[in-house]
């Protein structure tokens, strides 16, 4: 049920761009500040740390406002696992786009320090 990587990547980048454009104006600078990395699935290092192989996305690094010596050693970024998202969407392009959007917003929420309820209150989910 796989699709060519270039196709998955193009769809995901387009959907993330579209999602960022639709964010409230006060959140757009934050979206510009956190890079998005696109990978097929979690790598061996993440799996060794106990993450599930079917993980859809994750935020690494510290949320906005956390800047101390004991903070995360990783730079802030959102990871989207495109083949997992495609499989989760059962190979349906429109569903894939929607799952990319939902996963991006969910991980962006972690970057902002927001939980699911707060994202819903803001109308983002």
Regions found by a protein language model. Give the residues of each.
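Active-site rim/adjacent substrate-binding subdomains
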Residues: 1-99, 111, 117-120
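Short alpha-helical catalytic segment bearing the HExxH-like zincin motif
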Residues: 99-107
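Short hydrophobic/aromatic patches at helix-to-coil boundaries
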Residues: 121-125
């Amino acid at each position: 049920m796989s699709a060519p990587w270039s196709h998955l990547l193009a769809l995901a980048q387009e959907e993330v761009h579209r999602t960022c454009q639709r964010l409230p104006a006060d959140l757009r600078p934050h979206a510009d500040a956190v890079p998005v990395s696109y990978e097929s699935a979690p790598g061996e290092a993440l799996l060794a740390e106990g993450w599930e192989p079917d993980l859809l996305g994750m935020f690494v690094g510290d949320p906005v406002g956390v800047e101390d010596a004991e903070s995360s050693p990783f730079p802030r970024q959102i990871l989207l696992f495109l083949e997992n998202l495609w499989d989760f969407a059962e190979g349906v392009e429109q569903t894939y786009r929607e799952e990319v959007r939902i996963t991006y917003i969910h991980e962006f929420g972690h970057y902002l320090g927001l939980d699911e309820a707060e994202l819903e209150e803001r109308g983002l989910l």
